[in-house]
Design a protein with these regions (language model features):
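Short, acidic, small-residue-rich periplasmic hinge/interaction motif at the N-terminus
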Residues: 33, 38, 44-48, 82-84, ...
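Short, acidic Ser/Thr/Gly-rich low-complexity loop/linker segments typical of extracellular
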Residues: 50-66
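Short acidic/polar hinge/loop motifs at secondary-structure boundaries
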Residues: 70, 183-210
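N-terminal periplasmic accessory domains that precede
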Residues: 105-107, 149-152, 191-195, 208, ...
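Outer-membrane beta-barrel translocator/receptor signature
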Residues: 218-225, 233-284, 309-313
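Outer membrane beta-barrel strand-and-loop segments of large Gram-negative receptors
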Residues: 426, 435-439, 479-485, 596, ...
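Outer-membrane beta-barrel signature, preferentially recognizing the C-terminal barrel domain
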Residues: 485-493, 537, 568-617, 621, ...
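Surface-exposed extracellular loop regions of Gram-negative outer-membrane beta-barrel proteins
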Residues: 519-521, 555-602, 617-634, 754-768
Length: 815
C-alpha cells in the first residue's frame, strides 16, 4: 500500500469517526441581556457538569450578547455567568440529549449595586443591524463632536439631506423624523432648522427604519428616522458638558450640558443647549425662456447671497418616580426658542435673445423668523409580572408658535442703469400649531415563546396660519389681498395595531398590522377679492408589516433577512394651505389643498455577516408621490407641492465595519440606486429615470497615549428625482482627539469639507417652454474645536460607550 493510499484510508477513518462522535454530541446556545433588555457583550459564560461541578467549557458573549458551546456530550449541566457590576448568575439544570441542539431562553442579569463605582468600557460599533432597524452610535465618530443633529444625519449611512432640508433614506424621499419615539410634526424647513439647533452631544442613538414595525405611525414612505436623546438612569449625580466653537466664513457655537440625579425612588434628568449657527449660501439661478422651435428667446440670471443667522436655546427636563419595582411614573418638559434672520441680497438680470441686458433688479429680502416650541409628556409603565408582561401609556401636548416677518425690497433699473421703479412688500405671518396625543401599548410574552404586542393611539392637530401682506410704493401703503389669507386646519388620526414576534431555532419572525383612520378639514377664510374655501377628507387604511430572519448557523455568523411594509405619507399641514408666499420677485411658493396622501410598498432583503457587514437589496413602489414641482407662468416660477404620479426605487447597499490592524478601524457604506419617476406635470409627460451612486468611508486611527484621529469621505453621483437632476459632489473631513483629565475629558479638533468641494447644483426638467439650472456654494468648510467632560458622584454603575477617541482595546477597570 503506497503512501497516498495510507493517507486516503486515514482520512476516511477520521471522517467516519468524526461523524459518529458528532452524532453523539449536541450544541447549546443562548443570549444575555440586562434589565433594560439591552445585550451584554463580553460576559463570561461557564458550562459545568452538574454531578461533580466539573468545568467543561468557557465562552464569551459577542457584541449582541450571544454565546454557544459545540460538541457537548449528553447529560446534566448548568451555566455560571459573571460580568462586572452584575450579580453572578447560576442557571437551573439543563438536560442535553444527543443530536438535539438546545437553545436556552434569554438570560437577564441584575445589577449588583455593591460597588462604589464600576467603569465598563467597550468599543461600540458605528452601526448595528437589528431585525427591523439599523442603529447608529454618533459618539463613535470624532468628527461628530460639536456639530448639529442635521450634520450627524448627513453622515449616517444611506441618509441624504437636500439644500431645502428634505431628508431621504436609501434614495427615497418621504422620511418622518421622530424624537424619542414621537413624531416631530414639522415641515421640512422647520424640521431642518430645529435639527440644526440640536447639538450632537445630546444624541444617544439614531435608528434608521425603512420598514418600521406596526407599533410606529405608518407615516413616511421611506420609513422613520428615530433620534433617541441621552437619558441617564444611573444612581447618584452624573452628567456631561460639551463646549464647541466653529469657524467657517462665519463663526458658530454649540454648547450643551446633560445632568442626571437619581436617589431612592426618583430620577431627575435634563438636557440644556445653546448655540449660534451663522452660515451663507451663494446661489446662482439661470432660467432660459424658449421659443416654440427651442431657440432662446430670453435669459434670466439671478445671483443671490443669503446670510443666515440662527440662534437657539433648547431645554429638556424630566423626572421618573419608581412607585414600586413594577410601576414607573414620568413627566418630561421640553422646548426651544429659535430666532433666525435670513438676509437675501440678490441681483437679477434679464437678457434678450441676443444676450443683451434688458433690465436689472436689485433686491433685498429680509426674513425674520421666531419659533417657539413647548411640550409636555406624561408617561406610565407597569410591569405586570416578571415574565415580561407590561403595559404603558403616554399623554402628550405639543405647541409650535411662529412669528415671521418678511421685508422684500425691489429696485428695477433699465439697461442704461436708470431707476425705473422701487417697491417694498411687507409680510406678517404668524402661525400656531397645537397637537394632542394619547397612546397605550401592551406587551405579553407567550407560553410557547414569542411576544404579543397591541396598542392604540389617538392624535388631534389644530393649526392656524395667518398671512398679512402690504405693498409700499411711492410712499403709499396698500393691502395685498392676493397674498393675504387666513387658513385653519384640523386633523384627527386614530390608530390601533397588533404585533407578534417569535424566535425559533434558526428563524426569527415578526408580523404586525396597523389600522389608521384619518379625518381632516381645511378652511381658508376669504378677503375682499377671495371667497371662503374649504375641503374635508376621511379615509381608513391598513398597513401590514412582516420580518423574517434566518440563521443557518446557531451562533448567527450569517443572518439572512426579509421585510415588507406598507407606508403612507400625508401632506404637511402648511402644504395644504393654498396661500402664495414670495421667495423673491420672480419665485413664488404656493400651497396645494388638493394634495392626496402617498402610499408605498417597501421590500428589503438583507444579509449580515458576523454582525459586521450588512448587504441590503430594497425595492419600493410609490403611488401619488408628493414632491416639489416647478411651474413656469409668464416670467414667474411657482414652486408648490404636487402629486406627480408613481416612482420606482431599487437600491443595493453594503454597510460594514473592518479592522485591518489593531489600531485601525474602517466603516464603509456604499449604495447604488435606480430611480424612475413617471408623471404628468402641468400637462407634460415626464419620465425621469437614472441611476446614482453614493458612498461614505470613515477611517479611525488609535495613535496611543490618548490620541486618536479620523478621516472621512463622502461621494454622491448625479441623482434623479421627479423634475430634478442634481450634479455630483464629494467632500472630505478630518479630526483629531486627545483624552485628558484621567480620560473623563476630551479635546477634539475637526475640519469639515476640507477641500471646499460641497457645491450642490442641478437642472430642473418639465418646464414647458423654459429651462432652468442652479448652482450653489455653501459655508461648508468649518474648523470646530470641542471640549467635553463627563462627571459623576455617588454610588453608581457606569456603562460607558466608547467613542471615536477611546482606546481601541476592550478593558474593564474597577475603582
Amino acid at each position: 500500500m503506497n503512501y497516498s493510499k495510507k493517507n486516503f484510508f486515514l482520512f476516511i477513518f477520521l471522517f467516519v469517526f468524526g461523524q459518529i462522535y458528532a452524532q453523539n454530541t449536541t450544541n447549546i446556545s443562548g443570549n444575555i441581556i440586562d434589565e433594560d433588555k439591552k445585550s451584554i457583550p463580553f460576559a463570561n459564560v461557564i458550562l459545568r457538569q452538574t454531578k461533580d461541578n466539573q468545568l467543561i467549557k468557557v465562552a464569551v458573549t459577542d457584541t449582541l450578547g450571544r454565546f454557544e458551546f459545540e460538541n457537548i456530550n449528553e447529560g446534566e449541566y448548568h451555566l455560571n455567568i459573571n460580568y462586572v457590576g452584575f450579580k453572578d448568575f447560576k442557571s437551573e439544570n439543563i438536560t442535553l440529549i444527543k443530536q438535539k441542539n438546545t437553545i436556552i431562553p434569554t438570560i437577564t442579569l441584575e445589577l449588583s449595586g455593591t460597588l462604589k463605582e464600576v467603569t465598563i468600557v467597550y468599543k461600540k460599533p458605528f452601526a448595528e443591524q437589528k431585525i427591523d432597524r439599523t442603529i447608529i452610535n454618533p459618539d463613535v465618530l470624532i468628527t461628530n463632536a460639536g456639530i448639529s443633529a442635521l450634520e450627524v444625519l448627513e453622515k449616517s449611512p444611506g441618509v441624504q439631506v437636500s439644500l431645502e432640508g428634505n431628508i431621504s433614506l436609501k434614495g427615497k424621499s418621504g422620511v418622518v423624523v421622530f424624537i424619542d419615539d414621537k413624531p416631530t410634526y414639522m415641515s421640512a424647513d422647520a424640521l431642518a432648522s430645529y435639527l440644526k439647533s440640536l447639538p450632537s452631544s445630546t444624541i444617544e442613538t439614531i435608528e434608521l427604519m425603512p420598514n418600521p414595525p406596526a407599533k410606529y405611525d405608518a407615516a413616511g414612505n421611506a420609513g422613520i428616522i428615530n433620534i433617541r436623546l441621552k437619558k441617564n438612569t444611573l444612581k447618584g449625580f452624573n452628567g456631561s458638558i460639551s463646549l464647541a466653537f466653529g469657524q467657517g466664513f462665519y463663526s458658530r457655537t454649540n454648547n450643551s450640558i446633560n445632568l442626571n440625579y437619581r436617589i431612592n425612588k426618583f430620577n431627575f434628568f435634563s438636557n440644556i443647549s445653546m448655540n449660534m449657527n451663522n452660515d451663507y449660501q451663494d446661489l446662482l439661478i439661470e432660467r432660459k425662456y424658449l421659443k416654440n422651435d427651442g431657440s432662446v428667446n430670453a435669459t434670466f440670471r439671478q445671483n443671490s447671497f443669503i446670510k443666515n443667522e440662527r440662534y437657539s436655546n433648547n431645554i429638556r427636563l424630566g423626572a421618573d418616580y419608581y412607585l414600586s419595582d413594577k410601576t414607573t411614573l414620568g413627566v418630561v418638559f421640553s422646548g426651544f426658542y429659535n430666532p433666525t434672520t435670513a438676509t437675501n441680497t440678490n441681483k437679477s438680470t434679464l437678457f434678450n435673445q441676443f444676450q443683451q441686458s434688458d433690465s436689472t433688479i436689485n433686491a433685498v429680502n429680509i426674513n425674520n423668523r421666531k419659533w417657539w416650541n413647548g411640550s409636555v409628556n406624561f408617561n406610565y409603565s407597569y410591569k405586570i409580572d416578571k415574565k415580561g408582561k407590561e403595559i404603558s401609556a403616554n399623554i402628550d401636548y405639543i405647541n409650535y408658535t411662529a412669528d415671521i416677518n418678511q421685508n422684500l425690497e425691489n429696485s428695477v433699473f433699465l439697461s442704461d442703469n436708470t431707476l425705473k421703479t422701487q417697491d417694498i412688500l411687507r409680510g406678517v405671518l404668524p402661525a400656531d400649531i397645537d397637537i394632542y396625543t394619547f397612546k397605550v401599548d401592551y406587551a405579553q410574552p407567550l407560553k410557547k415563546g414569542g411576544t404579543f404586542e397591541a396598542g392604540f393611539k389617538s392624535g388631534l392637530v389644530k393649526t392656524k396660519n395667518v398671512a398679512q401682506f402690504t405693498n409700499e410704493k411711492n410712499n403709499l401703503t396698500t393691502v395685498n389681498n392676493d397674498l393675504s389669507n387666513l387658513f385653519d386646519y384640523n386633523e384627527n388620526i386614530n390608530a390601533a395595531y397588533l404585533n407578534f414576534s417569535k424566535d425559533f431555532k434558526k428563524i426569527s419572525v415578526q408580523a404586525g398590522l396597523r389600522m389608521e383612520n384619518t379625518n381632516l378639514e381645511g378652511l381658508q377664510f376669504g378677503n375682499p377679492i377671495k371667497r371662503d374655501s374649504s375641503f374635508k377628507r376621511n379615509y381608513t387604511n391598513l398597513f401590514p408589516t412582516f420580518y423574517l430572519n434566518y440563521r443557518p448557523d446557531s451562533l448567527g455568523k450569517n443572518v439572512f433577512g426579509f421585510s415588507y411594509g406598507r407606508r403612507i405619507n400625508r401632506p404637511n399641514y402648511q402644504s395644504l394651505n393654498p396661500f402664495s408666499y414670495p421667495l423673491d420677485r420672480f419665485t413664488i411658493y404656493a400651497g396645494n389643498p388638493f394634495l392626496l396622501p402617498t402610499f408605498s410598498h417597501n421590500f428589503e432583503l438583507t444579509h449580515t455577516y458576523k454582525s459586521k457587514i450588512t448587504t441590503a437589496l430594497t425595492y419600493s413602489y410609490t403611488q401619488n408621490i408628493i414632491t416639489e414641482t416647478i411651474e413656469f407662468e409668464g416670467t414667474l416660477f411657482y414652486s408648490r407641492p404636487g402629486n406627480i404620479g408613481t416612482q420606482k426605487n431599487l437600491t443595493l447597499a453594503i454597510n460594514g465595519g473592518f479592522n485591518p490592524l489593531s489600531w485601525w478601524t474602517m466603516q464603509l457604506y456604499a449604495q447604488v440606486t435606480y430611480n424612475q419617476s413617471l408623471s404628468l406635470i402641468y400637462g407634460e409627460n415626464l419620465n425621469n429615470t437614472g441611476t446614482f451612486y453614493s458612498t461614505n468611508f470613515v477611517n479611525q486611527f488609535q495613535l496611543g497615549k490618548g490620541w486618536s484621529s479620523e478621516i472621512n469621505f463622502n461621494y454622491q453621483s448625479a441623482a434623479y428625482s421627479a423634475q430634478f437632476v442634481t450634479i455630483p459632489f464629494w467632500r472630505a473631513g478630518v479630526g483629531i482627539q486627545k483624552k485628558i483629565m484621567k480620560d473623563k475629558g476630551a479635546l477634539k479638533l475637526n475640519v469639515s469639507d476640507v477641500f471646499f468641494t460641497f457645491q450642490p447644483g442641478g437642472d430642473i426638467l418639465g418646464l414647458g417652454n423654459a429651462a432652468a439650472r442652479f448652482y450653489s456654494v455653501l459655508d461648508s468648510r468649518v474648523f470646530t474645536l470641542n471640549f467635553s467632560y463627563r462627571f459623576s458622584k455617588g454610588s453608581n454603575l457606569k456603562l460607558r460607550k466608547s467613542g471615536g477617541a477611546d482606546d481601541e482595546k476592550n478593558r474593564i477597570q474597577t475603582k
